[in-house]
Swiss-Prot record:
Pfam families for the chain: LolA
Organism: Wolinella succinogenes (strain ATCC 29543 / DSM 1740 / CCUG 13145 / JCM 31913 / LMG 7466 / NCTC 11488 / FDC 602W)
Function: Participates in the translocation of lipoproteins from the inner membrane to the outer membrane. Only forms a complex with a lipoprotein if the residue after the N-terminal Cys is not an aspartate (The Asp acts as a targeting signal to indicate that the lipoprotein should stay in the inner membrane).
HAMAP family assigned to the protein according to its UniProt record, in alphabetical order: LolA (MF_00240)
Record-given protein name: Outer-membrane lipoprotein carrier protein
Length: 172
């Protein structure tokens, strides 16, 4: 659940120079370093579309999918055959956050979402490459995007959780 909350927080993130970004697709590597120095690495794919759609598909070390549509989050864990549905107080809008972030004097974009500060690095074309933040549990979180595509065609239906077969559905 902690990982999901990190992604939910991240889903709200953004870059100001990225006003022309309406959708985003990328592979990612997420590294979490705890206060005691332990490191956990996750790999997967992320999809985002304006105005408020997000999908994080974790592939390693375990499969997990996080679907975000406005204020609703569904965390699906195939190995457990269960999905958790939660409602948020605030909408998570990845694209709006990209547009809201501001470039500092060092060329790093910064955004604050729900009192959480994020730093975003962009390449020479102004495309998001890396995100860094320290979460509420004092973990250092770094997300590196690889093979990113800006403004790919993404159908809204891909962001809707449609379980196949029987699963346990938990509502929070």
């Amino acid at each position: 659940m902690r990982i999901a909350l990190l992604w939910v927080a991240f889903g709200a993130l953004a870059l100001a120079a990225f006003e022309s970004i309406g959708s985003f697709r990328s592979e990612f590597v997420q590294t979490i370093r705890s206060e005691d120095g332990k490191i956990i690495e996750y790999r997967g794919r992320v999809y985002a579309k304006s105005p408020y759609y997000g999908l994080w598909k974790y592939e390693k070390p375990m499969e997990k999918e996080i679907y975000i549509v406005d204020k609703q989050v569904v965390i699906y864990e195939p190995a457990l055959e269960q999905a958790t549905v939660s409602s948020l107080q605030n909408s998570i809008d990845f694209m709006a956050l990209l547009r809201q972030s501001k470039r500092n004097s060092e060329g790093i974009y910064e955004a604050t979402v729900f009192e959480q500060k994020y730093q975003i690095l962009a390449d020479e074309k102004g495309e998001p490459q890396k995100v860094f933040f320290i979460d509420k549990l004092h973990n250092e979180v770094q997300i590196i995007f690889k093979n990113a595509e800006i403004n790919p065609v993404l159908e809204k239906e891909m962001f809707l959780f449609m379980p196949s077969g029987e699963i346990d559905l938990i509502r929070q």
